[in-house]
Amino acid sequence: MNEVYDVYYSTGGAQLVGGGADVWVNNWIEEVAPHLDTKPILLIHRTRRGLAEITEHTKTFENNVKAGRGGNEGREVVKKIKKNYKEVLNTELEHLWQGDDPQKFRELLKGARRINILHGYYAPHKFIVENKEKIHSNVIHVSVRDCLKASMVLDLDRSLHTLMEQTWEDELCEVATHPIWIGVEESKLKYPTEHLPNYYEFKNNLDVTDSNRIGYASRMETRKCPHFLEGLDSMVFTNLRHIKWWEQNLNTDTSSWKKFGFTYKFLDNFMRKDWGISHSAHIFEPFGYSIFQAVDYGKIPILAPDWIPSYDYPFRAASPEEFREQYKKICELSVDGRRDYVFPLREYLNKTYGDKDVWREKMLRIYND
């Protein structure tokens, strides 16, 4: 390839959405990629789900709805997920999944003018190591140091997180021309970073409800503190295998939880279910898409003390005991009482983190310099 191009490297996005970083990548595809000066090529370091698999999954769900197991909400979900691959990922953006052609994937990295990491692995991989002198930017979605110490802070014997190496995070911060931190607060990383917070668009703005059931729509990694829900009436939307990990490794009692296997396309359906309080007390939370979503859907959150601590909010918890205490206080609130907390919080978050145009322009200044 003789044409000059920049590689944008990711480990997720498109139809592979397992968390906030993948949402960030999809926002980048839609909002940033069309405005890049140098030809962009998106490389996704994963094996994509085939159309046949996606179609089969959708058909199974649709059959369940037709059999009366989904109701009106289910029928609406079916309408939303009848999308093919081209609609999930903008095909005007040249892209390649590593699983489709590993050799070409490697060659494209080698031939790039620059490499911009949108969301990388948290440990070294040869594809990046052998091209690290080309890294122009690296977007940091979570602090490895914080993730690794979460179990100690929470006084837990074991920890659930992806493969991580602190030295790799440090090295990427050193070699990247632009190390970018996306959290709501300034970075506390070892090396200086540029602070470009994510954005969230409030599109639902739903009213609160009087339901005292708790909802949890996050991964089950240790810093998310899912064990705070032990013994509480809860609806949990997450990876079911990871629930098993908590049961088997930390003897977490999940008998009071109603469990739903996470699939991103069903998120809206889950958020509209009958629950009114959000477990959003995730320690070391960088941005917190799930927190923004909870507030957007009218769920009153219990937050961690370290999430936007400058915002005056009474319902915060850093332990199971504190979580139960805050839960009881919220249960005593009237609907109007809940509105008094949710609506001002929504207004603050929208004002502070809701400007997509500002986010886009800041990103483009880095990529187009």
Regions found by a protein language model. Give the residues of each.
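Nucleotide-activated donor-dependent transferases that construct or modify glycoconjugates
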Residues: 1-18
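Conserved donor-binding/catalytic core segment of Leloir-type glycosyltransferases
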Residues: 8, 180, 201-224, 233-234
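A charged, aromatic-enriched C-terminal amphipathic alpha-helix characteristic of glycosyltransferases
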Residues: 20, 332-369
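Short beta-strand->alpha-helix junction loop in the catalytic core
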Residues: 145-147, 166, 178, 182-206, ...
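Conserved active-site histidine-acidic residue motif and adjacent donor-binding/catalytic loop
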Residues: 240-273
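Short hydrophobic beta-strand element within catalytic cores of glycosyltransferases
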Residues: 299-304
